[in-house]
Amino acid sequence: MIINTGYYSDRLFYLANTAKKFYKNIKSIKYVPWNEIDLIDKKLNWIVSCYTETSTGMKLPIEELYKLKKRCNAKLLLDATASIGLETKHYIADVIAYSSCKGLFGLTGASFIAYNKDPKNEIESFYLNLENHKNKSMTGPYHTIQSLFLILKNYDQFKFTVKVNKDKFLKQFGYLSPFKKKFQPLLCTYVNKKIETEFQNAILYLPRLKLPGSVLCHLGEVHLKKRSKGQILSKLKIL
């Protein structure tokens, strides 16, 4: 079962259906809206979800995903690209996959998989076989991974700026967001109004979905580290 949270869960659903064509052990795939998961209580093999869905600016509370996992006696796989490093308790999942960008603040281009138990299924694809990656049978994205070297040394300071901007934005404009606090990710915020700016150094996030409002990504002051005060928010115009 895949939880529908937006564009990135749509992509997971597409990938799952593509895999179903090649692997007969995948019998069925359900796609359930995020606000209906409390109604699910039957046995499942896997639950797949985005922890933070940047296309809609929302987060699924990890505690609720854990309850769903236990209730359905299932394993949990998380797309953690936008949550890794910023949100907590990723260890609740059996498998997480994430990128070098978004939550890790790095360049795009590298992908990572973390899991509790080694997979037992046989994979014919050379690239998708984890053993080939473990054995370094192909060239890795070393330039991207190298970009993380200094980032991780200063990660707490970068994360501090995200939190400063998130807290300040919610204090000023939280009333425009349809999501309660428990659904608010640290990385971004959705508001039901359009946001513009004339400040040339501010780059607004463009979600992959057409939304009536805007998703604001809180990375605008990461370069300031501990000096961040959320002043870039004064450059925004709420329409």
Regions found by a protein language model. Give the residues of each.
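Conserved PLP-dependent catalytic core of the aminotransferase class-I/II
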Residues: 152-184, 192-199
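Conserved C-terminal alpha-helix-loop-beta "cap" of PLP-dependent enzymes
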Residues: 177-239
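Active-site phosphate-binding strand-loop segment of PLP-dependent enzymes
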Residues: 31-80, 84
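Active-site C-terminal subdomain of aminotransferase-like
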Residues: 101-171
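Conserved active-site segment immediately N-terminal to the catalytic lysine
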Residues: 90-101
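Active-site-proximal loop->helix
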Residues: 11-21
